């Protein structure tokens, strides 16, 4: 079973701010999920061929195409925080991660 400290670490890595009640609840739920995966790992899959999808699909992605967009100023004006000829986006990576 996961303890509250492990749940806090998972929440930190997922950038979630959770309450102490949620820590307790998530500890139980995540433990149940891990127990289920443990059961799945006990299954005999010796003669089961590997698959990438449960249902075979083909042509599920479109071909990439390049088109010039001639009104660059209009596009930049739609951005919430343009900086010169670029889009300024929020920082998502920290260097002080564990």
From Swiss-Prot:
Allows the formation of correctly charged Asn-tRNA(Asn) or Gln-tRNA(Gln) through the transamidation of misacylated Asp-tRNA(Asn) or Glu-tRNA(Gln) in organisms which lack either or both of asparaginyl-tRNA or glutaminyl-tRNA synthetases. The reaction takes place in the presence of glutamine and ATP through an activated phospho-Asp-tRNA(Asn) or phospho-Glu-tRNA(Gln). It catalyses: L-glutamyl-tRNA(Gln) + L-glutamine + ATP + H2O = L-glutaminyl-tRNA(Gln) + L-glutamate + ADP + phosphate + H(+); L-aspartyl-tRNA(Asn) + L-glutamine + ATP + H2O = L-asparaginyl-tRNA(Asn) + L-glutamate + ADP + phosphate + 2 H(+). Keywords: ATP-binding, Ligase, Nucleotide-binding, Protein biosynthesis. Belongs to the GatC family. It comes from the Bacteria. It comes from Crocosphaera subtropica (strain ATCC 51142 / BH68) (Cyanothece sp. (strain ATCC 51142)). The lineage of its organism: Bacteria, Bacillati, Cyanobacteriota, Cyanophyceae, Oscillatoriophycideae. The keyword ATP-binding applies. This is Aspartyl/glutamyl-tRNA(Asn/Gln) amidotransferase subunit C. Its EC number is 6.3.5.-. GO terms for molecular function: asparaginyl-tRNA synthase (glutamine-hydrolyzing) activity; ATP binding; glutaminyl-tRNA synthase (glutamine-hydrolyzing) activity. Heterotrimer of A, B and C subunits. GO terms for biological process: glutaminyl-tRNAGln biosynthesis via transamidation; regulation of translational fidelity; translation. It holds the Pfam family GatC. It is an enzyme of class 6 (ligase). The keyword Nucleotide-binding applies. Residues 77-98 are annotated as: Disordered.
């Amino acid at each position: 079973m996961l303890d509250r400290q492990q749940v806090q670490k998972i929440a930190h890595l997922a950038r979630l701010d959770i309450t102490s009640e949620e820590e307790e609840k998530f500890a139980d739920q995540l433990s149940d999920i891990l127990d289920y995966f443990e059961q799945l790992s006990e299954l005999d899959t010796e003669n089961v061929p590997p698959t990438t999808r449960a249902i075979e699909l083909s042509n599920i992605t479109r071909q990439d195409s390049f088109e010039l967009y001639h009104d660059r100023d209009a596009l930049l004006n739609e951005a919430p925080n343009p900086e010169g000829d670029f889009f300024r986006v929020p920082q998502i990576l920290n260097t002080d991660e564990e």
